[in-house]
Amino acid sequence: MKPLFKIVFVVLLLTLAAGYLYREPLKQMIFTQITEGMFVAEDNDDFDPGPAINSHFPGLQATYQGRSVTLIDEFKGANGTIVVASRSLDWCPYCMRQIIQLQENKARFDAAGIGIVVITYDDPILQHAFIDTFGITIPVVSDINALSFKTLGILNEDYRPGEFQYGIPHPGMIVVDPQGRVVGKLFLEAYSSRVGAVAALTFAKAALGLN
């Protein structure tokens, strides 16, 4: 092997090794760049999937900590619940950033008596990888065969069974009062945009009559 080729070969190996060793920091750096400017202050479009306002929240068909979950009662706060429908905590950078931001502001929701529960289509093993990495204490449940998202009327129908992304929802938030009544929703047509955590809390408090 010629000296130049040896040098190129060694540099390539070192680059690959560095990429492997620092793959998670690199991934997070890329995700940070991708998600810059994703948060907005309000629901600024007319995209409005999901259960009707003033209807009864229909429940879930999901798993949480190895058991079946159909009700959101165990996740609710004294004044209500925000159900966060998210695409994936395994591959969707916007979803990951949103949940990290919600976690950063969880104390504010707790102080307002508003519980949060997140639901994605991910396998629980993939969810826990994210939860453990970022110290997420917000409950995260796993939809079963897209049944929750179908029932809620938020399943993204651009994908078909067998496709990688089949089962993802239109991402958004549903505000439910202590009696199980839907009192507010935040859905944006662009999956790359989300209402920020503080703005979502302000919206939820108003919808629940807490202001």
Regions found by a protein language model. Give the residues of each.
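Hydrophobic membrane-insertion alpha-helices, especially the h-region
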Residues: 6-22
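Thiol-/selenol-based redox modules, centered on thioredoxin-like
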Residues: 164-211
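Structural microenvironment flanking redox-active thiols in thiol-disulfide oxidoreductases
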Residues: 96-148
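Structural micro-motif
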Residues: 135-139, 154-161, 166-174
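Short active-site neighborhood of thiol/selenol oxidoreductases, capturing the structured segment around
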Residues: 71-102
